[in-house]
Amino acid sequence: MIIFRTKLLPMVFKRHADTFFILVFSLIPLALHFPYRVNIFLSWEGAYRLYLGQHPYRDFGLPMGFGYWLLPALFFKIFGPNMLSLVKAQVILNICGGLAFRGILKRLDVSPGVRLAAVLTFCLSYILINFWPWYNNTDIIYGIVGLYFLMVAYSERSLSRGAGALAGSALFLFLSFFTKQDGGFLMVAVGLAIVVYEAVFGREWARCGIFLGSFALVAVLFLEPLRGTAFGYWFNHGQPPHTARLSPRDILGEFLEFSQWIKFYSLLIILIVVWKARRGSFWNNQREMVFLLVTLGMLGTAAIFQVTSYTPPDNNIFFHAFAIAYILDGLASLMSWDASRYAWLLLAGVLLWWSGSYFKYLNRLFPQPVAVAMGGENVINRHTYMINTDTAHIEDEGTWTEVPGMPAFHKIKMPPST
């Protein structure tokens, strides 16, 4: 029995290691204390008003769809209106996004080794940095879940079984759009590209109709209660006093002047596609084309999203995991090597590649000396060669503490002056 268990545990871990990574990285925030962030009031405000039963666009105004606050408001109902409930809501969003990304790769028949490396990339690049709910993250998470249901729908041979997945895809893609217009629209566009491809080349016209009908039905169910409200004013489509963020010149300029990773990935993907196409049957391969559409769609989304939603500057880095999954899968196919045999090497490479995501937290355990006054000692290095005389800098977060007697701010640190 002991021998059996000894052999069983590594097998179970190997089979579900990607799920393990998703759960661990998503649950990390529950064990931490957080410094208060000024803009987090936006997450609180909308969720709290929904928690009170107020009606969006009638009792309070929003510059976006209220899909952003649905899950935080639910967690306010379950755990009470406190800041930690927002963190718990983001934990669920991260788990859903990670599992949906994993599910997309499984439905695309990506090998376990490549899938494990891609999931770890997703965890380090996108899950680890997002521990507060934020609309520029929530819309992408909803979109990834919607794309997963789309993968499920088209992998089911039975139309009746696929219909439920198509309805689920329509729901989450609409929620993505109804959370943030730009990111949500781009995620819907990726989904529509897959639906149109399957309809034209796979003759899946019935599924196309079910998806479009489901999307229209979901839209009616969400928008009908908003009739007679100020939804048209608050929904930003560039009308005064809003301004349109969709500038082709800005998008092209950002892409050509910066976007090094997006351009690098695009070059590798083009080379892989050309190589595969020369070997024949690439353009008629449904799996290859859908995988390519998803990957290019996410790269295109990231290229536009970084201009239309420019804060925070790293809100578009979800594309890394999709791109590396396609590139590693393509290299494994072209070179005929089993990525699963080199899984640990791939994981080590990803950990080194994305070491900046976690090293900045580990580095806090060993703070470096900083020169704050002239001294007689001859200690000059890259950490001490400049004297900080700025008296207007933000207060050191190391001095922040919890506010006693305020349960809503449990485990949330604030400046002592607060």
Name the predicted role of every residue range:
Residues 101-124:
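Transmembrane-helix signature of polytopic, membrane-embedded enzymes
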Residues 62, 66, 79-99:
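Loop-to-helix entry region of an early transmembrane alpha helix in multi-pass inner-membrane enzymes
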Residues 131-140:
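Short acidic/glycine- and proline-prone juxtamembrane loop motifs at membrane-interface regions
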Residues 139-158, 165-173, 194-195, 322-326:
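Specific aromatic-rich, kink-prone transmembrane helix
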Residues 155, 186-216, 279-282, 331-334:
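Perimembrane helix-loop-helix junctions
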Residues 162-181, 187-192, 217, 298-307:
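Membrane-interface alpha helices of multi-pass inner-membrane proteins
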Residues 32-47, 52, 56-72, 81:
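Extracytoplasmic catalytic/substrate-binding loops of multi-pass membrane glycan-assembly enzymes
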Residues 207-250, 257, 261:
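Membrane-lumen/periplasm interface segments of specific transmembrane helices
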